[in-house]
Amino acid sequence: IADIEANKDKYTAIGTEAIKEGKVAALLLAGGMGTRLGSDKPKGMYNIGLTRDVYIFEMLIKNLMDVVNQTGAWVPLYIMTSEKNNDDTVKFFEEMNYFGYDKNYVDFFVQEMAPAASFDGKIFLEDKDRISTSPNGNGGWFISFVKAGLCEKAKKAGVEYINIFAVDNVCQRMADPCFVGAMIDGGYRSAAKVVSKATPEEKVGVLCLEDGKPSIVEYYELTEDMRYQTKADGELAYKYGVILNYLFNIEDLEKNMKNNLSVHIVKKKIAHIDENGNAVKPETENGFKF
């Protein structure tokens, strides 16, 4: 991290060349709904403007357009939606004329779903004839990407690196030439953008080494000791907050498909119907999502 500022120009030049050669693509994880924002629409459709309409999707596309203008090359953009928001998302992009992005470089695909269960292992019902499901988490994006035929399409187009980013952060830069160049120049097979935690209590996952291997520990998994642990210089030992902005080599992703990831179980508030068919909207966590 200390070398980035000193080598910024070199990294940017390397990354710019890779983008011009069509080796870099961006992939937006946008399967979520804006429920916590008080919206029943896809999270990316949420209007964050103060004096005019400005949408989350719009800001993300604007950020990517900055890279297009900087490098003079379009970056292939893949947008992962979910069963619950795909139609609204695609329609919104069409209505907004893709916010000025060349639609020939944009592909949508739908994330796999997983059932939701109660704490005692019973499957919830969303309706009388439909079990309750939710998107299967960020870790499932690549399987969905492959099943949609987009991995093969990307490889045929010459894509070697995919920058994964989430819909939540409108300030982030994706397909960042400096970020791309730093990974290529260092000979790394993957990379992550991080920000320093503002306080020990900040609710953000952290990037760290676990048994000598890069790992992410979610904020709710940090023990009290880990949260406040400091190094000799007084800085937090677990300070590198992840913002869900990763760069991967596409060949490595294909190789790793042979390895099954462990299921990450998360406690959530899950709306469902009870045995009498009445709608239940819990105020506290009542089950697991996977």
Question: Could you describe each region identified by the protein language model?
Answer:
Residues 98-99, 103-203:
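Conserved beta-loop-beta/alpha segment of the NTase-like Rossmann-fold superfamily
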Residues 23-27, 44, 74-79, 105-107, ...:
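Beta-sheet entry/capping signal
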Residues 1-107, 115, 125-142, 150-152, ...:
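N-terminal glycine-rich phosphate-binding loop and ensuing alpha1 helix
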Residues 30-31, 167, 250:
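Residues immediately flanking
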